[in-house]
Amino acid sequence: MSLTQSAKLHIIHQSIGKITTRLYDTSPFHGDSHCKQRRVKDNCIQFNMNISNVLKCYSEIESFSINQRIRRSISLFLSILRSFYSMRMRLLDLFITSSIPVAKILLITGIGFYLALDQVNILNHDARKQLNNIVFYVFSPSLVASSLSETITYESMVKMWFMPLNVLLTFIIGSFLGWIVIKITKPPSHLRGIIVGCCAAGNLGNMPLIIIPAICNEKGSPFGDPESCEKFGLGYIALSMAIGAIYIWTYVYNLMRMLANPAGETAINSTSSTMPLISPKVEVAEQVGTWGKVKQRVCSVAEKINLRTIFAPSTIAALIALAVGLNPLLRKLLVGNTAPLRVIEDSVSLLGDGAIPVLTLIVGGNLLNGLRGSGINKSVIMGVVVVRYLLLPILGVFIVRGAHYLGLVTSEPLYQFVLLLQYVVPPAMNLGTITQLFGSGESECSVILFWSYALASVSLTVWPTFFMWLVA
């Protein structure tokens, strides 16, 4: 039995009301890739049924005398609603989702700041130095080893092959932008290494480890089931953290050391220039050809690079974890609930759990020096902030989306989100460890870290919101 025209109009009226209500009351995702949770899937199905009813009834009442403008307005209204529902996520939900992990970091940092006050004097300079050594030699290597060994396999290595290249690009591009900041601001020589380090090395460890689980477990997350999201997300972060640790202690550490000690290089060059007046052996060296000069240059660079810093504890832990994860026999012995030697892996994992809170407390204590000031130029701080929170994220969007367009990156939203997140994190906390190992620049580094992490609450809310919309 066919419906009357008035009945059809009544169905249209009810359906439009239901659609409008669901725009505010339901999670705005559609399609198989986003409707993974039962509640969201039901809402998507009901929404599509409402749309179908409206369009079907609307197409059958052509003979009904409705003004053409009204019909076009209704059609345009329905198109806008459907487009909004299918292509846009609720920005308020995403804003809240991405701001929660930042609030956690700031809260723990505030506790570290309080413990470092002179009135409390629990986390004083000596205490931070000792804790820093414990993190460097125990906590951080344990965290890298446990996270990487649990998640790394041949299959995951093939799937995530672009991630090491992506992290390397963040370091290289950041170094280049840091060099531009140095040329513009003209800071003292002892600050050059700190500036380049802050622009190059991002916090690929505890920041993403807090951000990803928080986003996965929040209502409105575009990454599907919370358990699967957290499992795969932590796997991506573990590899990112391990690669970042290797780059920091091989590339950034030696780069900061060489940039911070130009006087030592001058002394070496000066000594070599006076050697012909003292040693007759140089006369033979002057006759050496191009190959000899290249060999001398390689030896000179090798002398400047300290192998002990390249093979830092975190680097060694990453190499061991790779060997365990990629070797099926070792993996069966050490990793998993049924592994005979799982007590070793559990103990390492337990030690690694202390890395994030202790590192965050140390940063909070170091920020106290930043508040007291060190006479650092404001343009230097502004340059680092612009590089880390504006230029790098913009370039990261083009790199990751370009790689996806070329087929170098899979279409998985969570994987792309982690790749994008690597461009927007604040400077690495290990930079504070490096400056303390150098014994200089701690105050200036604390100032930069203070303002970087203070503004991270804005950057790590705005950019992840945009990234989630971009990849969803």
Swiss-Prot record:
Pfam families: Mem_trans. Residues 1-93, 155-161, 215-231, 331-347, 401-413, 468-472 are lumenal. The chain crosses the membrane at residues 94-114, 134-154, 162-182, 194-214, 232-252, 310-330, 348-368, 380-400, 414-434, 447-467. It is a multi-pass membrane protein. Expressed in flowers. It comes from the Eukaryota. Its main location: endoplasmic reticulum. It is found in: Endoplasmic reticulum membrane. Residues 115-133, 183-193, 253-309, 369-379, 435-446 are cytoplasmic. GO terms for cellular component: endoplasmic reticulum membrane. One of its GO terms (biological process) is auxin-activated signaling pathway. Signal peptide: none annotated. Keywords: Auxin signaling pathway, Endoplasmic reticulum, Membrane, Transmembrane, Transmembrane helix, Transport. Involved in cellular auxin homeostasis by regulating auxin metabolism. Regulates intracellular auxin accumulation at the endoplasmic reticulum and thus auxin availability for nuclear auxin signaling. Belongs to the auxin efflux carrier (TC 2.A.69.2) family. This is Protein PIN-LIKES 1.
